[in-house]
UniProtKB/Swiss-Prot annotation:
Superkingdom: Eukaryota
Keyword field: Cell wall, Secreted
Organism name: Nicotiana tabacum
Taxonomy of the source species: Eukaryota, Viridiplantae, Streptophyta, Embryophyta, Tracheophyta
GO cellular component: extracellular region
Protein name: 33 kDa cell wall protein
Length: 11
């Protein structure tokens, strides 16, 4: 789940 940490990409 790096996407959320990197730039909120998942959200």
């Amino acid at each position: 789940e790096q996407c959320q940490d990197m730039a909120g990409g998942a959200r």
